[in-house]
């Protein structure tokens, strides 16, 4: 993201360098100013400032020399009492960072941070700001999401100036230290600390570890001795950790978007007829929805959904993708097919089909890249689904786009999603293969492979005949109304042996649980032609396959009418279970874009006895 004109570069903010002198590269003056600037860093803006400092107000263009003067201005002019919010919510340092970034993001949208009302200009917003109302959403503050750890403004000097959690104003060496009075080798301690802090902000968490483990500094002249790790305040380390957390998310995002830069995965997705034709039919088959509509395509990839939307008669299509490579490809594809919007072309020269603009950005940052239409979008379309529906966690970006860019009552496609589960038999494992390899018994290998599968989920296509139980619904999502926290859920369900799963002996072994999903383009929005996209093992296979979770040990099952009452352990050949009661939790993992799955399993016999197996934890 380009540096905004009204923002200062971080070196200028911290070291107090004059902008022109910095750009002219006058090294001698820089060295002097660097030493002087360290005192400014230590005092952290104790001097009250006017409008010409480096700290930008959260609501208007006023600037200040200190945090206290800035927040005093916010309280008196904008009715935003930062310190009161901190006190009443009991926020820690990271909460303060999130709050500042949250407020800045809302102000950028001309939206009241407290009540959410939207205005047409910043002046109208500032005229509206009212007495403190701390918004709560289901008992949580709306800035609690870790996405707000990432600075909304590039090089936001206010984040480096927060002193609300500072314990004291003295240096951490335990004694007054004059400028240049303590050195480390050939460089000053100030320079070393400043350099390390810059490295933390630039490099991430690995540098934080080095920073905290830094060895003791020994002065050459005996004036001062102390740990370098003690010199910068806890506040600076917290800023570094917050920055590193945001950078960690960015790093995963870059890897994620980079993985979609390969044409192989797009070839696979485009070649998935179930997937592509479902979107095609929903977009082309519903003219009352699409004709003249403004459309936002989140995660556009090659641009295929945008092309369908344009062909369906959309008046404007904004295609968004986080991969620079795919944005370039989608732009070229769109241009080659005569759908690319060219703002430099005269209106009389444009064809009605030239409606697509491709933008390189994440959905959460779209309004920083382009001017979002004032009346927002009529239709939001995205192919966001991952393995087990929620892997990759792209759904959060779609929900963000829905809440910020879709007009009230606008259509989201697809608008429903449902996760299903069922038990599978021996054919769903690799055991049959290893039991007869060119006439040789290698079942010992099969058992080891199956044991490994009990620790890791497997994405594969199962044949419908390998499903031995009835199907259960784990969870359903209404994408038009759901909240982001609903992506984390726990579901309890029961599995009974299906008619097709009954074996000749009467006992069938269930080796685990398989999950799949359907997404619906329902008649809520697709009135002429509703469409259902299914990844079920009973339907045509898709590139999503199914997600397989193998039990630590298989469970014997039988129909209730044929089950034998026995004192043996439930789930064995002697006492098969007539029902498996399972509880599955799926939550977003600490690793960005991953999910954690826990499975609790209980077998119930025909006489009501129960046997529970240890909880299994999987990461996808």
Swiss-Prot record:
Instruction: Give the InterPro entries listed for this entry.
Output: ANM3-like_C2H2_Zf (IPR049482), Arg_MeTrfase (IPR025799), Methyltransf_25 (IPR041698), PRMT_dom (IPR055135), SAM-dependent_MTases_sf (IPR029063), Znf_C2H2_sf (IPR036236), Znf_C2H2_type (IPR013087)
Every copy of the SAM-dependent MTase PRMT-type domain together lies at 253-582
Enumerate the Gene Ontology biological process terms.
Answer: methylation
Per UniProt, the ranges with Basic and acidic residues bias are 1-17
- Report what the protein is called: Probable protein arginine N-methyltransferase 3
User: According to the UniProt entry, which residue ranges have a biased composition of type Acidic residues?
Assistant: 18-45
Species this chain originates from: Oryza sativa subsp. indica
Q: Which reaction does it catalyse?
A: L-arginyl-[protein] + S-adenosyl-L-methionine = N(omega)-methyl-L-arginyl-[protein] + S-adenosyl-L-homocysteine + H(+); L-arginyl-[protein] + 2 S-adenosyl-L-methionine = N(omega),N(omega)-dimethyl-L-arginyl-[protein] + 2 S-adenosyl-L-homocysteine + 2 H(+)
> What Pfam family is a match, any one?
PRMT_C
Per the entry's comment, what about the domains? The C2H2-type zinc-finger is responsible for substrate specificity.
The answer, when asked if S-adenosyl-L-methionine is one of the entry's keywords, is yes
Keywords (alphabetical) are:
Cytoplasm, Metal-binding, Methyltransferase, Repeat, S-adenosyl-L-methionine, Transferase, Zinc, Zinc-finger
Which EC numbers characterise this protein's activity in its record? 2.1.1.319
Query: Where on this chain does S-adenosyl-L-homocysteine bind?
Result: 275, 299, 321, 323, 364
This entry's Gene Ontology molecular function terms read: histone methyltransferase activity; protein-arginine omega-N asymmetric methyltransferase activity; protein-arginine omega-N monomethyltransferase activity; transcription cis-regulatory region binding; zinc ion binding
């Amino acid at each position: 993201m380009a540096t905004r004109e009204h923002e200062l570069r971080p070196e200028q903010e911290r070291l107090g360098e004059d902008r022109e002198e910095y750009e002219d590269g006058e090294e001698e003056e820089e060295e002097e100013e660097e030493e002087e600037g360290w005192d400014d860093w230590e005092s952290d803006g104790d001097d009250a400032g006017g409008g010409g400092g480096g700290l930008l107000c959260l609501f208007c263009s006023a600037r200040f020399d200190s945090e206290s003067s800035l927040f005093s201005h916010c309280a008196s002019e904008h009715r935003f009492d930062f310190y009161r919010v901190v006190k009443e919510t009991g926020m820690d340092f990271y909460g303060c960072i999130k709050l500042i970034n949250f407020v800045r993001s809302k102000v950028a949208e001309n939206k009241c941070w407290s009540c959410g009302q939207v205005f047409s200009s910043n002046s109208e917003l500032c005229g509206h700001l009212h007495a403190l109302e701390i918004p709560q959403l289901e008992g949580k503050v709306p800035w609690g999401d870790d996405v707000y750890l990432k600075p909304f403004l590039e090089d936001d000097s206010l984040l480096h100036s927060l002193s609300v959690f500072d314990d004291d104003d003295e240096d951490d060496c335990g004694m007054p230290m004059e400028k240049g009075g303590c050195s480390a080798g050939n460089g000053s301690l100030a320079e070393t600390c400043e350099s390390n802090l810059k490295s933390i902000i630039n490099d991430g968490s690995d540098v934080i570890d080095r920073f905290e483990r830094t060895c003791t500094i020994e002065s050459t002249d005996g004036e001062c001795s102390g740990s370098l790790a003690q010199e910068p305040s806890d506040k600076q380390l917290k800023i570094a950790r917050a920055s590193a957390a945001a950078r960690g998310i960015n790093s995963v995002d870059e890897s994620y978007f980079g993985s979609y830069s390969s044409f192989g995965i797009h070839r696979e997705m485009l070649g998935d007829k179930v997937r592509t034709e479902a979107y095609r039919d929903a977009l082309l088959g519903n003219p009352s929805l699409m004709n003249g509509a403004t459309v936002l395509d989140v995660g556009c990839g090659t641009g295929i959904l945008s092309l369908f939307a344009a062909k369906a008669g959309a008046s404007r299509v904004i295609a968004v993708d986080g991969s620079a490579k795919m944005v370039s490809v989608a732009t070229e594809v769109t241009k080659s097919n005569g759908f690319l919007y060219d703002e430099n072309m005269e209106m009389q020269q444009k064809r009605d089909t030239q409606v697509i603009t491709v933008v390189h950005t994440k959905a959460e940052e779209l309004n920083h890249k382009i001017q979002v239409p004032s009346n927002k979008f009529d239709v939001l379309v995205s192919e966001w689904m991952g393995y087990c529906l929620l892997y990759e966690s792209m759904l959060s970006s779609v929900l963000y786009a829905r809440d910020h860019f879709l007009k009230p009552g606008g259509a989201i496609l697809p608008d429903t999603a449902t996760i299903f589960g069922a038990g599978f038999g021996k054919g769903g494992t690799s055991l049959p293969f290893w039991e007869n390899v060119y006439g040789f018994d290698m079942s010992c290998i099969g058992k080891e492979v199956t044991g490994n599968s009990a620790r890791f989920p497997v994405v594969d296509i199962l044949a419908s005949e390998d499903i031995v139980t009835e199907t259960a619904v784990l969870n359903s999502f209404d994408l038009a109304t759901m909240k982001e926290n609903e992506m984390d859920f726990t579901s309890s369900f029961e599995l009974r042996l299906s008619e097709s799963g009954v074996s000749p002996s009467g006992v069938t072994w269930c080796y685990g649980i398989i999950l799949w999903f359907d997404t619906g383009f329902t008649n809520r929005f697709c009135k002429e032609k509703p469409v259902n996209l299914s990844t079920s093992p009973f339907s045509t296979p898709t590139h999503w396959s199914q997600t397989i979770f193998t039990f630590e040990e298989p469970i014997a099952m039988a129909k209730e009418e044929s089950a034998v009452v026995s004192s043996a352990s439930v789930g064995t050949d002697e006492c098969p279970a007539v029902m498996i009661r399972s509880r599955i939790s799926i939550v977003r993992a600490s690793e960005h874009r991953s999910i954690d799955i826990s499975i609790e399993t209980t077998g119930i016999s025909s006489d009501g006895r129960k046997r529970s197996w240890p909880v299994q934890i999987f990461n996808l």
